[in-house]
Amino acid sequence: MAKSISQETLHQMVTRWASPRPDNYRFKIFKDTSDFFRVEYGSVVVLDEKPFLVLGNAKEGRFGIDDQEKFWVKRSIDLTDGSRKIIKLVFYEKFMAKIGGIPWECFRSPKKEARVLKLVAGHKNFMQGYAVEDEKGNVVRVLDVIKGKTLHAYLQNLESDHQTYFYELFPDILSKYIECIKAIKFLHENGEKHGDIRRDH
């Protein structure tokens, strides 16, 4: 049984890394993340006895569409060291996709994501993080935040004529793109597939 963490201790930890809460504020503490809708702003998720303050749901824009909220993905602060983390809670989504008239089923797999995170640990061309089970056995992924723009956003904001782009900017862009392709090759060589390759990632 995991040790319980007191409200007083949480207030002290939060004050160190974020805006302090009123003295009478009571943090909702989650060791079971099964109902991810209940895990909201100001909650604390405890994973392997480590507390994370939830800052809100992550959002992701897609192909020019405004940011879409991902209710199972939480922005957070690791209260032991103040680092920003993304916490992906378990969400078993399934949907059908079709390319060239061929349909297939797509689904989210927390165990696969956990396996891939372990495989790519320390690889400079992959997001870093780790997986941990909550007290109900849900495989939660804790990810480091990547700062900066996507390649897509970077290219959209370039202002140069074609010749300057092609001779001065493109060689470096292509070199970085090839690194991305080699990273995907690394996954394939190790029996894994990415599953969500998009130009806006």
Task: Give the positions of each predicted feature.
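Juxta-kinase regulatory segment immediately upstream of eukaryotic protein kinase catalytic domains
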Residues: A2-F63
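Activation segment signature within eukaryotic-like protein kinase domains
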Residues: K176-Y177
